[in-house]
A protein has these predicted regions:
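Conserved alpha-helical positions within TPR/SEL1-like repeat arrays
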Residues: 35-37, 65-75, 99-110, 132-143, ...
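TPR-repeat structural position
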Residues: 42, 80, 114, 147, ...
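Canonical positions in the second alpha-helix
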Residues: 52, 56, 89-90, 123-124, ...
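Structural marker of alpha-solenoid helical repeat scaffolds
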Residues: 55, 59, 93, 127, ...
């Protein structure tokens, strides 16, 4: 799931663009660093792309690809401001560069600037519709608690990519928050078929079972979520609620442990319609 207050599931950056070797950088190694997706460090990628830019031999669309690649590296390093600047340069050089719009949206998303992210995702989807683009836009809607539009986008993502586990997971959460519990349960179960050990999906399904008053099933899913990720407040608090509703006073210690990890966890559950009771 993608809960703004607990865990924002990462959006999907468009892969690095390989610019080709029509012009030479300062060294072949620096170009390889700029274009490589997996074999180099983030700092090497930044250095390589910076060398290509400084050499001044790339122009137009080719130079846009270099700026996009360096922006991806800055984003991976957590330097969103520089990433946004590089994506902006890429877009100025190539106004139809869908990947740069998508990637700038991801950077805005990471900074909590969801309206700007939505505008960039919108443009990316106009230029080149993709499952990842719809998923990213859905995440921005979800962060704004615009659950209906988020669900619409996850529908499109799943239509284009039937095994998109993260889209099933996030659609599950959006539906759960809206109280559309049976479809939400189906989505979480499908996400778990695709990624069985996903703690976030397990605690989403546990939350659905909690709302359905199926407390044993809720405890089972929260137990599984905590086995894979033991220091998370959301499943701890949910398990505590489910235990208390089942008459098990061990729920008190779960809820206390959850509050120690996240002081406002009770308020978060209350926003989703699950108040603490004694």
């Amino acid at each position: 799931m993608c809960r703004l207050t607990a865990k924002h599931l990462s959006s999907v950056m468009t892969a690095l663009v390989l610019a080709g070797s029509g012009a030479f950088a300062q060294t072949p190694q620096e170009r390889q660093w700029c274009e490589s997706e997996n074999e180099v460090t983030v700092d090497q990628r930044i250095d390589g792309c910076s060398a290509v830019i400084k050499a001044g031999r790339e122009k137009g669309d080719k130079l846009a690809e270099v700026f996009n690649n360096r922006g991806v590296a800055y984003r991976l390093k957590g330097d969103h401001e520089r990433a946004i600047a590089d994506y902006g340069q890429a877009i100025r050089l190539n106004a139809r560069f869908a990947a740069a719009y998508n990637n700038r949206g991801v950077a805005y998303d990471a900074r909590g600037e969801y309206d700007r992210a939505l505008a960039d995702y919108e443009q990316a989807l106009k230029l080149k519709p993709s499952a990842e683009g719809y998923f990213n836009r859905g995440n921005a809607h979800l962060a704004k608690r615009d659950y209906d539009h988020a669900i619409d986008d996850y529908n499109q993502a799943i239509r284009l990519k039937a095994d998109f586990a993260a889209a099933f997971d996030n659609r599950c959460w959006a539906r759960a928050v809206l109280g559309v519990l049976k479809p939400a349960l189906a989505d979480c179960s499908q996400a778990l078929r695709l990624t069985p050990r996903n703690a976030a999906t397990l605690d989403s399904r546990g939350f659905i079972f909690l709302k359905m008053a199926q407390f044993d099933a809720a405890v089972s899913d929260y137990d599984a979520a905590l086995r894979f990720s033991p220091k998370r407040a959301f499943p701890l608090y949910g398990r505590g609620l489910a235990r208390l509703k089942n008459g098990d006073t061990a729920g008190e210690s779960d809820m206390a442990a959850a509050k120690a990890l996240q002081s406002d966890i009770a308020e978060e559950y209350a926003r989703y319609g699950m108040q603490e009771t004694r």
